[in-house]
Amino acid sequence: YEKRGVAVMVPQWNPAKCIQCNSCAFVCPHATIRPFALTEEEAAGAPAVTKFAEKPVVKTNYRFTMAVSPLDCMGCTLCVKACPVNAAADKKAAAAGTKADPADYAIMMKPQATQHDQQAAFDYCVAKVSEKPELINNTVKGSQFKQPLLEFSGSCAGCAETTYARLITQLFGERMYISNATGCSSIWGGSAPATPYTVNKETGKGPAWANSLFEDNAEHGLGTVSYTHLRAHETVLDL
């Protein structure tokens, strides 16, 4: 059972203050906080603990939620620090010589035990809520409506490497080959018996990953690309 629940503090989303920018999900190294756009039918089937923003996703009728997996979160606080609503609240309070009221934050850290009910909402959204192609694009906001194909890795809390790797899988993951160089990425990316790379739940496609020895990943990657091109050429000739 790999949902370790190791974080002392995990994020709590405040739908009343959220501006739906998705910056929190964009910086999350472990894909444990994710935006979802739900149809009325999907929203009706969601667990009672699911929180929704008052306003729908812009220019749609979709219900917006930011789902958090407290049992997968590492407690790095990057989501809290990246939130522009939080930054604005802190700036306003600093100008007044006070501290910001937590009620003015769109996301804040809370003890993990107080957030366990949100696991059901996260699990439901991951399993049952479909992607909405019209919302997906190569922006901070739009990219986060795409399912990440790297999730819940064993990288350290706040790891920038898995943040970038997760984002790349959202942009290109269904047609992505990874020739991994030995290092941190071979530990969080391929430790037996599990892998954090996954497949898109609707297409069944995901990254193809392999790890060569230390400095040989460039040659290994070249071989992978060369054979892929050769196989494609042979397939065309066979038609």
Residue ranges and their predicted role:
Residues 158-159, 187, 193, 202-203, ...:
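Metallocofactor- and cofactor-centric catalytic cores in central/energy metabolism, strongly enriched
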Residues 110-112, 181-189:
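A glycine-rich phosphate-binding loop feature that marks nucleotide/adenosyl-phosphate handling sites
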Residues 124-134, 197-208:
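Acidic, Ser/Thr-rich peripheral helices and adjacent loops at domain boundaries
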Residues 154-182:
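N-terminal amphipathic, basic-rich helices that act as targeting or association modules
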Residues 229, 236-239:
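Single conserved hydrophobic/aromatic residue that forms the stacking wall/gate
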Residues 23-42, 69, 78-114, 135, ...:
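Iron-sulfur cluster-binding cysteine motifs and their immediate structural context
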Residues 23, 38-40, 44-49, 78-79, ...:
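Short acidic, glycine/serine/threonine-rich loops at helix termini
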Residues 1-20, 37-75, 107, 113-115, ...:
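Ferredoxin-like iron-sulfur electron-transfer modules
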